[in-house]
C-alpha cells in the first residue's frame, strides 16, 4: 500500500534493511518477501557479517543519474566525504561474505531453519500460556509474552528480562525488545546465525522452554 501511495505522488520509496537484509529472512532482502520494489535500500550489519564495519545505500540507475550534472562525463557522479571513506576492507569483506552465503546455500538454510524455529515456538506456545503470539520470517522471529491472551496485556518487562537472563545462564543468547513504549517491551527476539543447524535451533527453544517454566511456573 505504501508503495502505491509513493508511486502515485512521485515519492521515492526508501526501505531500511539494516537489520533484516542480506539473508536474514531467507531472501537477500526482506522486502523481496512482499513484492515491493524500492528506489533506495540502506543496509549494514549482515553486509559483512560483522567481520568489518560497513554500511551502504543502494539505489537505481535512474535515481543515481539524478545526481549527475553531465551524464556523458564518467567522473561526474555523486560524492560524499566521511572519515572512513575509501576504506577497501569493508567492501572486500562484504563481497566475500555474500559469496559465502551463495556458495554455502545459506538463504535456503535460513528458510529451513526458520521454519523449524517457528514450529518449535508454536509448540512452546501450546505449552506456555504466557506466549501470546509468535511471528517472524526466516531466522528473524519473536515470541510475545502476555499476562492474558485475550486482552494481550503484556507481562511486566522485568519478567521478560528474567527469561533472557535465564537463557543467558544456560549459555543461550536471546534478545528482548527494549525500544518500544515503556511497559510494552515484552517480546523475545530470535536471530540465530544463518549457518544454524537443527540442533542449534532446538537448543535455543529448549533454553526458552526451561526459562519460561522457571520464571512463570
Region annotations inferred by a language model:
Residues 1-217:
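Conserved N-terminal phosphate-binding loop of PLP-dependent enzymes in the Aspartate aminotransferase
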